[in-house]
Amino acid sequence: MANRNLEKLASIDAHLRLLVPGKVSEDDKLIEYDALLLDKFLDILQDLHGEDLKETVQECYELSAEYEGKRDPKKLEELGSVLTSLDPGDSIVIAKAFSHMLNLANLAEEVQIAYRRRIKLKKGDFADEAHATTESDMEETLKKLVYKLNKSPEEVFDALKNQTVDLVLTAHPTQSVRRSLLQKHGRIRNCLAQLYAKDITPDDKQELDEALHREIQAAFRTDEIRRTQPTPQDEMRAGMSYFHETIWKGVPKFLRRVDTALKNIGINERVPYNAPLIQFSSWMGGDRDGNPRVTPEVTRDVCLLARMMAANMYFSQIEDLMFEMSMWRCTDELRVRAEELFRTARRDVKHYIEFWKQVPPTEPYRVILGDVRDKLYNTRERARHLLAHDISDIPEEAVYTNVEQFLEPLELCYRSLCACGDRVIADGSLLDFLRQVSTFGLSLVKLDIRQESDRHTDVLDAITQHLEIGSYREWSEEKRQEWLLAELSGKRPLFGSDLPKTEEIKDVLDTFNVLAELPSDCFGAYIISMATSPSDVLAVELLQRECHVKQPLRVVPLFEKLADLEAAPAAMARLFSIDWYKNRINGKQEVMIGYSDSGKDAGRFSAAWQLYKAQEELKNVAKEFGVKLVMFHGRGGTVGRGGGPTHLAILSQPPDTIQGSLRVTVQGEVIEQSFGEEHLCFRTLQRFCAATLEHGMNPPISPRPEWRELMDQMAVVATEQYRSIVFKEPRFVEYFRLATPELEYGRMNIGSRPSKRKPSGGIESLRAIPWIFAWTQTRFHLPVWLGFGAAFKQAIQKDSKNLQMLQEMYKTWPFFRVTIDLVEMVFAKGDPGIAALNDKLLVSEDLWPFGESLRANYEETKDYLLKIAGHKDLLEGDPYLKQRLKLRDSYITTLNVCQAYTLKRTRDPNYHVTLRPHISKEYAEPSKPADELIHLNPTSEYAPGLEDTLILTMKGIAAGMQNTG
């Protein structure tokens, strides 16, 4: 198969070169990388499980490839009969093999992207394949602003050092790959990149070959399935591991590159170390919306754990800095401090490895940094004690309690070096360290708290009932506001210890008590989901005051559903009209807009347009009241939940809605894609910072009035069609549950939170992630495209000139272009033939016409999209992506078919299959089948092996689509 596979891959490559000769360069290594990994893997498979199993994998691959060529449904049935005849152990091995091959294809692709980028930069070209604007590189962006758009270098520098990008890592349950495997994947990537380095010796090559073999085999031999559900603390540790592995060192490295880019446009200053260019926040252990497992104790643990990790990372670096700071020339200010510290230093020196004796005053910088090291040690140990025992005997004065205390001695060293003519030394590791302290502080990340507005209403209702002044829940909005403002303006406490509390009320109040107990720099924003009115915001302000939160968190309303987005500007105007609130916010307000629930509620088309309009209107309201507005974008990883390339998403936002301040969620599997490797981390930071700068200094065009009018009309049609099918069609939920693996999603143990807000109920109560996940698995992607076709059809039928208008919008308006391109990309990943197979096997016959009409709608929508984009074929403007998707099609199809038939076997007790004798030989005992794999899941309610096979197909398809939910 390896040779045949290489031929097939090469033919895809040749076909692409013919299509667009200028676009696919001859130095493209993707085919080579992919074939090498596949070769290695197939050899391993044969060694471990025998020739017969390897041949079955090849047979499945070839049937898939034949299907991909002609889309002949008979080939899927042939493939199905091969897969259903396998015994349970073989079935697991084959599903695992295809899932593994898709992960290897992803790794080949990542190494190729990094390789191509290096080649481009060496040539001095723009870094991206098609055109510069799709990849925001810092240096390119600065040069473009200065040389093409005639901005002055000083103006650009000024904008840059005042901008902030805050990346908020969330534990959304979409990372379907286990951490054990992610680490092995990282090592495979490194081996592959080094194997193709120019100056590699034969011995190096042999050793790397062995290492690659070892890591591929180790990954294949690791159980891909999480056998228990992760806790919020597990999720937080997984999220924080990226800081340890890439982000910690990535930030100073990125800021150095910004310094270099500034030098190249004539600015001879560095970005100040305290410029808030990049910030990190987290929802892991703070997001309790619909997740009962995030308790106040979890929030406290997560904050202390992050503080301990931060102190530990600083501590592990401080000795290197002490080695570097061996200079003796210093300012009088620093010398006096060093002598004072030397005199008063306690003699009970810690058991340090380096500088374990007292440092002499002739090395003043080391004396100062030695004191910093002692305090960091104590800071780490105190956090550890509090985490383990709730109490610590290390006094507060021996630790750093705020970041200013930590920065002060470091700034003293920096000033002294500069004053003594050693700026070049100051701008080395010390500057990097200062930048890390400014970025990560003592808490590593700022934890956001998220809670549903109803939970606050419950607490206030309990309080008003206890005070015997009525039921807060039943009061009108006016009465609620009046009472809240009266209490906020007064001084008296609202309730005492005698307040009767249910578990839920105690949970909410205890969360506020944790906010009061821990240092304020642990926390970021308090986000209220399902916020609709000013009283929702005032309620949180009052509860913070009542629970004695010394530095109250900024309160951020989250608008998600279509109706809430429409009402958001009016709600914010009412809030800004309240004098007490206007004084409280000091001219700054953050508003969060949710992409996933708005898409689930109204479909992607209407959600995208409403999000665009809501931002424009919110910006105008804020301007009217003299408030600086920060938009917080709650984007998922998939297009159905607002995902897509970062730089394009930023550059297509309405003009003046970012203005140098951007907050955005980085969710689930996107964290790995953004920060899994050093070069990915670097690229992510570049993209966000460069695109934010460009959006502010070179805003996209505003849509013309006639475009707006057309969009408004189309949005009505799109919403109507989407809702008429998803919410009004009486048997839609039944069809959805039969045609997709939605009901089986929970078995993957991806995240700590339940997949439903309420245990029973229809689409409304289903979370957006499993909703998208289920459709992604069947490659039908219904939530992404449903409504687009009807909207375009109606617009063009109403007036044929609208087609030209839509084509013009596509060419000149970034928002519209990005929206269409993302849906086109999803169509390129889709295959209605797979959805048809699922219908045939899993859906009751009387619902088949419903599936057929949806597939007809799919084809019609695709045709309209191509017409508007002016393309003959999907992705003709992006040959690289086309090539990458083609490479993985045959693997995914095998898993799709395996999933459909496995679902049939788990759901239909009357479906009988004839199993052939087992073909897999276990390496240690060739006579023994691979049935020990079945014993990894002893509690399955299905026939042996079926549940694991099913979960492996879900994980493999998620890896292949590169989108989970």
Curated annotation (Swiss-Prot):
InterPro entries tied to this protein: PEP_COase, PEP_COase_bac/pln-type, PEP_COase_Lys_AS, PEPCASE_His_AS, Pyrv/PenolPyrv_kinase-like_dom
Family annotation (Pfam families): PEPcase
UniProt-listed GO biological process terms: carbon fixation; leaf development; phloem sucrose loading; tricarboxylic acid cycle
EC number annotated for this UniProt entry: 4.1.1.31
Lineage: Eukaryota, Viridiplantae, Streptophyta, Embryophyta, Tracheophyta
Regulation: Activated by the allosteric regulator glucose-6-phosphate. Inhibited by malate and aspartate. Up regulated by light-reversible phosphorylation.
Residue list for modification Phosphoserine: S11
Tissue: Expressed in roots and stems and at low levels in leaves. Preferentially expressed in the phloem and in root tips.
Domain of life the protein comes from: Eukaryota
Source organism per UniProt: Flaveria trinervia (Clustered yellowtops)
Binding site for D-glucose 6-phosphate: W283, R450, D597, R635, T665, R753, R767, A768, I769
This protein's UniProt keywords: Carbon dioxide fixation, Cytoplasm, Lyase, Magnesium, Phosphoprotein
Subunit structure: Homotetramer.
Cofactor(s) needed: Mg(2+)
Catalytic activity: oxaloacetate + phosphate = phosphoenolpyruvate + hydrogencarbonate
Signal sequence bounds: none
Function of the protein: Through the carboxylation of phosphoenolpyruvate (PEP) it forms oxaloacetate, a four-carbon dicarboxylic acid source for the tricarboxylic acid cycle. May be involved in phloem loading with sucrose and in anions and cations uptake and amino acid biosynthesis in roots.
UniProt keyword Phosphoprotein, yes or no: yes
Name the record gives this protein: Phosphoenolpyruvate carboxylase 1
Localisation: Cytoplasm
Family: Belongs to the PEPCase type 1 family.
Binding positions (L-aspartate): R641, Q673, K829, R888, N963
Gene Ontology annotations for the cellular component aspect, listed alphabetically: apoplast; chloroplast; cytosol
Enzyme class label: lyase
Molecular functions per Gene Ontology: phosphoenolpyruvate carboxylase activity
Active site: residue positions: H172, K600, R641
